[in-house]
Amino acid sequence: ANYLRNITNRCDLDVHKVKDGEEIDLGGKTLTFISAPNLHWPDSMMTYVKEEKLLLSNDGFGQHLASDGLFVNEQPLDLVVNEAKSYYANILFPYGAQAEKALNTAGTLGLDIEMIAPSHGCIWSGKDEVNTILGPYAKWASGKNEGKAVVVYDSMWGATAKMAETVMAEFQDAGIPVTKHCLAVENVSEVMVDFLDAAYVCIGNPT
């Protein structure tokens, strides 16, 4: 509250600090607040509009997806889910505990969510779409891995690349699914998606 007063230079600014689960009636629209710190700003918060069964989820459940459509059902579903996974892996990955807490709070409050409108990307509409993203989000936030390995490397003269091949072969011989990424030619944001549910991460760095 004091921060808002200071940055607006209004010492008399009337600020009400809301808590998890607190409701405010705007006159026909009831807002319920869910604190979501570091998702992905320190002051992030989600807001549930009771009458619309709508969760305004801030950065949660979002995607970096350029689309002329507003809704998920205007895109291939697997594309949007993959983009949501990429957004989580690259933006929210370090804050799994906070994401899990926000999900648990929503569950504890018994929110009946039929639409999720994130700050970025398409809107999830209908119970089926909402459940389609809630499940993966709970998994990502929990930190559960899929038992796979990721080998990431760059190589100046080929020696580190040979080492990466050897490490990859060891995982394959052990029956462990493994993917390999050369950072000289691959996008780091795509590598992060593999990191999200990996049990083993091996990084090769040339000297």
Model-derived features: positions:
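Catalytic core of the metallo-beta-lactamase
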Residues: 8-74
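Hydrophobic packing residues within well-ordered alpha-helices of enzyme cores
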Residues: 4-5, 160
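Divalent-metal (often Zn2+) His-rich catalytic cores of metallo-beta-lactamase-fold enzymes
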Residues: 50, 54-82, 90-144
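A generic local structural motif
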Residues: 18, 34, 41-44, 101-104, ...
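N-terminal beta1-alpha1-beta2 submodule of the flavodoxin-like/Rossmannoid cofactor-binding fold
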Residues: 128-207
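Short, flexible loop segments at the rims of nucleotide/cofactor-binding pockets, characterized by
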Residues: 31-37, 91-95, 177-183
